[in-house]
């Protein structure tokens, strides 16, 4: 009997891990997002709620058509998404994201930042604070996925995206970061 319980628990953990690898924003309800992604009973190894939220934030901005990064708006975005999901638990996460309008204080226009400048700053940040560099890259990854028209979150694609973006910035140093994020080719999960 104990063996059956252990097997059942193991299967649930593996299901959570595989679910966390790819998330369909159009079919995931707010209540499932809050219970299974942001506060799972058994967290998936390597899961990072901040990076997931950062990806969603970048995705939301990219989907809105804006071409700016809001440096001080992550907390406000997270609280607004949480409130929207609590008020509308059956709403899809994709629809909830469309309702959130980030605080637009201190916007950084991505059309005003050259790839070369971004790439050198990113490399410096990787040396001093890898975690922060990854968090910023997650925002850019979410933004770029939104620009492809996909509505799938797959955190395993971050390294491929980062390598493609950095290689393209090396090839096109004078291109602005917004144009590069729209043009970069990476293996985005397909709808």
Question: Predicted regions span which residues?
Answer:
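Compact alpha-helical subdomains of small soluble proteins
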Residues: 23, 39-112, 118-191
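Positively charged n-region of N-terminal signal peptides that target proteins for export
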Residues: 1-5
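Sec/Tat signal peptide C-region and signal peptidase I cleavage site
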Residues: 16-20
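Bacterial N-terminal signal peptides
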Residues: 6-15
């Amino acid at each position: 009997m104990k063996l059956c319980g252990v097997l059942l628990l193991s299967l649930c953990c593996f299901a959570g891990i595989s679910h966390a690898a790819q998330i369909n924003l159009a079919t995931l309800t707010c209540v499932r997002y809050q219970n299974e992604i942001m506060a799972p009973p058994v967290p998936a190894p390597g899961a990072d709620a901040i990076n997931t939220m950062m990806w969603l934030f970048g995705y939301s901005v990219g989907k809105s058509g804006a071409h700016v990064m809001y440096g001080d708006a992550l907390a406000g975005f997270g609280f607004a998404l949480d409130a929207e999901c609590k008020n509308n638990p059956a709403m899809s996460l994709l629809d909830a994201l469309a309702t959130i309008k980030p605080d637009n204080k201190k916007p950084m226009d991505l059309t005003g930042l050259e790839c070369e400048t971004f790439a050198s700053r990113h490399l410096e940040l990787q040396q001093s604070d890898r975690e922060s560099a990854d968090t910023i890259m997650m925002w850019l990854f979410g933004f770029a996925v939104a620009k492809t028209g996909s509505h799938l979150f797959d955190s395993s694609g971050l390294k491929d995206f980062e390598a493609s973006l950095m290689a393209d910035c090396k090839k096109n140093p004078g291109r602005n970061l917004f144009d590069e994020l729209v043009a970069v080719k990476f293996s985005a999960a397909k709808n």
